[in-house]
Amino acid sequence: LIADRARSKILLALASGRELSASVLADEAGISRSTASAHLRKLADGGLIAARNDGRNRHFRIAGPEVAGVLERLMELAPPEPITSLRGSTRAAQLRRARTCYDHLAGRLGVGIMHSMLQRGYLAGGDGLFAPEQAVDDHPAGHGRDLDYRVTDAGDAFLEQIGVRVPDSRRPLVRYCIDWTETRHHLAGRLGRGIRDRFLEAGWVKRSATHRALKVTPAGETILEREFGLVLQP
């Protein structure tokens, strides 16, 4: 189902966690609207995406974090797609620097934030590194299961200080993924979503129009250096 190139491009566009229209997804996949409709129907029937009617329009979203995790895993395993344009090269660099992984931050940004919180004692339970020779259930680009990270008292105070509100749900508070570009841990779970939401709400990062890349704003660069000791390289 996801081996088809057009369908995989549709899924990757939706992996940001946002809802997108069929026309936007057709443009992302480089196919016609009618062809996109057929692919979207197959993905919905397969339980990988969900649709919402908005008047005469339909918007689509990824079915859940588990699907996004599978996509990250496949991206790590798949051979890199040849970059044949400046636009493609720029997008690849942007994704490595800062992107969303479903509803949390990934790339150098996500990995750097988690590393900083571990170094400063805001998180405990591991070192943020992926050691394949020691891993039992952890795999690149998948949800981590080997370690049990937790927020410390100092971490609770820090999160309150920078305005992070953790959403209520039955999802675990702290989860982690093995980042597919950095091969280190980034935060997921409710905490990962709360941090992403705060960065977007405060204007520290801005979304791309369609794909998962994020742009760190000047205000975001300041916060990262001041609160996390993190200088994000281009």
Predicted regions located by residue number:
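Short alpha-helical elements of helix-turn-helix
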Residues: 2-11, 37, 68, 111
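Short helix-coil-helix linker/hinge
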Residues: 1-7, 64-65, 95, 107
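N-terminal helix-turn-helix DNA-binding core of bacterial DNA-binding proteins
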Residues: 1-32, 58-60, 100-101
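Accessory beta->alpha helical hairpin/"wing" motif in late/C-terminal subdomains of nucleic-acid enzymes
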Residues: 60-63, 127-160, 209-227
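Canonical helix-turn-helix DNA-binding module
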Residues: 22-49
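Basic, amphipathic "hinge/linker" alpha-helix immediately C-terminal to the N-terminal HTH DNA-binding motif
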Residues: 19, 54-78, 151-155, 220
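Beta-hairpin "wing" of winged helix-turn-helix
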Residues: 44-54, 58-61, 126-127, 208-209
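Amphipathic alpha-helical dimerization/coiled-coil segments
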Residues: 16, 69-128, 158-194, 200-202, ...
